[in-house]
């Protein structure tokens, strides 16, 4: 958890295991950077969200000495305070000579809902692909802060570095698979055979590195504090997850907290949902909730 009270000059001592994880993360960055250069003649692209995991991978990228750029995908449902925080971080990055940009979507979440007549849910994630996971042509190799500790579902995923390829020939065999991964310190699970280093997705041609996939929450916070990084101010106000306001993947308490703080975004959700329900009723295709049409 974030440290609310601490002396300014206090040094947070990391454990040998944590120091080892940091060193391994450096190697993951360096391996991926070489691959990005070899395959695309481009630097890595760090996907920055403003959350604690993003702060970690950004700092690790700096410390690893690799060439990289930073991007943030604006979703139009972002907490305004998070947008302000990202702008401050990016201003400092530009002062350091690091290329960074905020990518604005073609359609807002509210327009997507009105045009698709779908309300985002845990099952119907119509928003994520276009707003959060959209690919940029000049970002073929990205870095994210995905971690197994965030959810059981992510632990079931195979990868520290996942390759999403448009052609089936681009697979683990393409780069030597587990042998290359092990040599680079990428494959750290006890049962490597149960986890593929690379995954394939024909829908997008992009490679993804998740350098802190095996870090715990304590690893994340201890690392940030050891570097003097306070992180997003929203954490100190009780937020445990920095993401879209009203996201159905967040818990009910998190949504209530966000809506109370940002009433304009609550109204945007309310109006878009009301439009979808009414329009579908007019079309004879009403929304169904608990087996009954929504009136």
List PLM regions with ranges.
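Nucleotide-activated chemistry modules centered on ATP-dependent adenylation/adenylyltransferase
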Residues: 1-295
